[in-house]
UniProtKB/Swiss-Prot annotation:
Cofactor(s) required for function per UniProt: Mg(2+)
Protein name listed in UniProt: Adenosylcobinamide-GDP ribazoletransferase
Purpose: Joins adenosylcobinamide-GDP and alpha-ribazole to generate adenosylcobalamin (Ado-cobalamin). Also synthesizes adenosylcobalamin 5'-phosphate from adenosylcobinamide-GDP and alpha-ribazole 5'-phosphate.
S-S bonds: none
Species per Swiss-Prot/TrEMBL record: Vibrio vulnificus (strain YJ016)
Length: 255
C-alpha cells in the first residue's frame, strides 16, 4: 500500500474517533492502526477548528458576535459529540468524588453526572464563552480558535507517550490508547502543535509553547498523584483545560 494512502486512512480513523464527521466506510480498522492514528489527533483539531470558524463567520453575518459564539460552541459540541467535555466531566467526578484509586476509576465509568462533574462542565462552558467573547474583536480571532483546537489536542495526546494507562483496556472505548505511543507519533504531534502555535507569530507562539510545556508537566504530575496514570477521560479533560488555558494566555497578550 502506498505510504500516502496509509497515512490518509490513519487520518480518517483519527477523524472518526474524535468527531462525528463521516469518513469512507472502506477505511480499515484495527487497534494497531487506531494507535498509530494518534499522530493525527492534533491535525483533527485543526480541521474541527476551521469548521467552527466557518460557522462563526457565517453566523456573524446575521447575529451579534456573542450569539455567533454560542452557535459556534453548539456546533462544536455537535461536531465532536461533546466527546472531550464528557471526558472532563467524568474526570472531575472521579477524581473529585473518589477517595481511593478503585473508587475514582469506578466513578469515571459511571454514565451519571455528579456534583463535581456538573460544576466543572458549567464553569468550563461559561469560561469558554467569556474568553471567546473577550477575544472576538481581535483581527486574528479565527486563527486563535484553530490554534487552540490544534495545540490543546497535541498536548493531550502526548500524555499517552510516557504515562501508563490505568483503565480497564478490555472494556474501555479508548482501548487502543492503552498501547504505548511511538516516538514517531510523538514527533508528529509536537511538530503539529508547534507549527500551530507559531502561526500567531514567533513571540506569541513561543509563549504558548512554554505554557503547553508547563501545563503538560503539571497535569501529568497531578494525574500520577491521583490515578497513577491516565484514562481516555483524562485526555478529554486535558484537552478542555488546555484549550481554556490557551485562551487565557492570548487574552493576557492582547490586553
Amino acid at each position: 500500500m502506498k505510504t500516502w494512502q496509509y497515512q490518509y486512512q490513519l487520518f480518517c480513523l483519527a477523524v472518526s474517533f474524535f468527531s462525528r464527521l463521516p469518513v469512507p466506510k472502506s477505511t480499515p480498522y484495527s487497534d494497531e492502526r487506531m494507535n498509530q492514528a494518534g499522530r493525527y489527533f492534533a491535525l483533527v483539531g485543526t480541521l474541527l477548528g476551521l469548521l467552527c470558524v466557518l460557522v462563526y463567520a457565517f453566523a456573524s453575518l446575521f447575529f451579534p458576535y456573542q450569539v455567533a459564539i454560542v452557535l459556534m460552541m453548539a456546533f462544536s459540541l455537535l461536531l465532536t459529540g461533546a466527546f472531550h467535555e464528557d471526558g472532563l466531566t467524568d474526570m472531575a467526578d472521579g477524581i473529585g468524588g473518589g477517595m481511593t484509586l478503585d473508587k475514582r476509576l469506578t466513578i469515571m465509568k459511571d454514565s451519571r453526572i455528579g456534583t463535581y462533574g456538573s460544576a466543572t462542565l458549567t464553569m468550563a462552558l461559561i469560561g469558554k464563552f467569556v474568553f471567546l467573547t473577550t477575544l472576538a474583536r481581535q483581527p486574528d480571532f479565527g486563527l486563535m480558535i484553530v490554534v487552540a483546537y490544534t495545540l490543546s489536542r497535541a498536548v493531550a495526546a502526548t500524555l499517552i507517550y510516557d504515562m501508563p494507562y490505568v483503565s480497564d483496556s478490555d472494556t474501555s472505548k479508548s482501548k487502543p490508547l492503552a498501547n504505548a505511543q511511538s516516538s514517531t507519533e510523538l514527533a508528529i504531534l509536537i511538530l503539529t502543535g508547534v507549527l500551530a502555535a507559531i502561526s500567531l507569530g514567533l513571540g506569541v507562539g513561543l509563549l504558548l509553547i512554554l505554557f503547553a510545556i508547563l501545563f503538560r508537566w503539571a497535569f501529568k504530575r497531578w494525574l500520577l498523584a491521583r490515578l497513577g496514570g491516565f484514562t481516555g477521560d483524562c485526555l478529554g479533560g486535558a484537552q478542555q483545560l488546555m484549550e481554556l488555558g490557551i485562551y487565557l494566555v492570548l487574552i493576557a497578550v492582547v490586553q
